[in-house]
A protein has these predicted regions:
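DPxDG-like acidic metal-binding loop motif
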Residues: 110-134
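Alpha-helical scaffolds flanking conserved acidic
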Residues: 98, 134-137
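ATP-binding N-lobe of GHMP and related small-molecule kinases
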Residues: 1-108, 130
Length: 137
């Protein structure tokens, strides 16, 4: 099974930065601007576990400059999957491979954290054939 979803970014014109917290979910910017087509594309594959294999989630994050190997960036996607797990929406007899493609730079006011979380949740809802809107999870 596989599902792909994307969410455009946002060019912020007026903003205030909130980076004091250690929690990535409490960081970011707030302001006004306009939406752009470039953003985040997320593809999720769900593969049945082999004999003796345990439930796992593998996250790969790619930018225009190459792969990102930063746990802080990956935590956003871990938080989304944990929310789905808490609500018992994931089949733990499957292994999940998540490929995230960031089309705009991080921490530059393009709304990439929100676009990433939303595209990931949309892809999971599609994969799981949920009728719930991703923003309701």
């Amino acid at each position: 099974m596989q599902a792909t979803a994307r969410c455009g970014g946002h060019v912020t014109l007026l903003f205030s930065i909130h980076s004091e917290s250690e929690d990535p979910l409490q960081q970011g910017s707030r302001g006004a601007g306009f939406c752009v087509e470039a953003g985040v594309e997320c593809t999720i594959q769900a593969i049945p576990l082999s004999e003796g294999e345990e439930f796992s989630v593998n996250i790969g994050i790619q930018t225009t400059d190459g792969p990102i190997d930063d746990e802080t960036v990956a935590l956003l996607y871990v938080d989304v999957i944990e929310e789905f797990m808490q609500r018992k929406l994931l089949d733990e007899n499957l292994c999940y491979h998540i490929d995230v493609t960031l089309e705009l730079p991080l921490s530059q006011g393009f709304g990439m954290s929100a676009a990433g979380a939303l595209s990931y949740a949309k892809a999971l809802c599609s994969l799981l054939e949920l009728e719930t809107e991703p923003t309701q999870i």
